[in-house]
Amino acid sequence: MKTSVLLVILGIAAITVQCTASESVKQDSLRTFVDAVLGWNAEMASEARCGGWMAKCADSDDCCETFHCTRFNVCGK
């Protein structure tokens, strides 16, 4: 009787570990997708701030480089 109870408990623990591991993989792929979308939005916002190749961005410390604003770059260098 004690052996069967122990086996049931070990089985439940194994299933729980497997489900938890499977869930974290799903969450990681969802997180990757969300990060990709948010990164794309940030890239689009950066392009919108640029006036053109190596132009000055709206922020005085920013400079356009390949139509993306980059922090602490000096235009023309």
Curated annotation (Swiss-Prot):
Probable ion channel inhibitor. Residues 1-21 form the signal peptide. GO terms for molecular function: ion channel regulator activity; toxin activity. It comes from the Eukaryota. Its main location: secreted. The keyword rRNA processing does not apply. The keyword Disulfide bond applies. The presence of a 'disulfide through disulfide knot' structurally defines this protein as a knottin. One of its GO terms (cellular component) is extracellular region. This is U14-theraphotoxin-Cg1a 2. It is found in: Secreted. Residues 22-49 form a propeptide.
